[in-house]
Amino acid sequence: MNFNTSISISVQKCIEQAILDTPINDQDFNTLALGVFAYQYQENRAYQKFCHALGQNPDLINHWHDIPALPTDAFKMDSYPLTTFPVEEASKTFRTSGTTTETRGLHHFTSTKLYDQSIITAWNELNLPDASRSLFLIPHPDQSPQSSLSHMMGVISKQLAEQSTWLIDESGSINLNSLISTI
């Protein structure tokens, strides 16, 4: 195991524990966010350059509110991927919908484990409606594998729903037969 992998696993374990320990208090969240910022700054060269251009680094930041936020256009720059790993190691890539421009942003993952865990934890923590019988007005994740929203609802479907109906068909239209038979 190399140094980068060791750091990555440590950061992931801290985030995973924070997700499981919800609600997290402000001080613990601040400590976690500063740790993630330091990791991202150290391992994500594109983000490090962005922070450097702003005159910021982990030694100057004491509160998570002050962590430099990337503009959404930064995710559209293929030549500067926002990852802490080689892009070729991504097991999942989500794309933005592309509604604002023709260039779609990219968000790469080596694993969606934390992402999936946070979806279920947030759903339960926020006391969102019972999902045991779910109607999804979006494409099934198999039809739209680059959609983070479809992925999120797929996680809800797999982990919380006893019955799921996906109402958008492959052409992007509402499947009226499924809708009528479900209601």
Residue ranges and their predicted role:
Residues M1-N62:
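N-terminal leader/targeting and accessory segments in enzymes
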Residues F3-N4, C14, A18-L20, L54, ...:
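Active-site phosphate/ATP/adenylate-binding loop shared across adenylate-forming ligases
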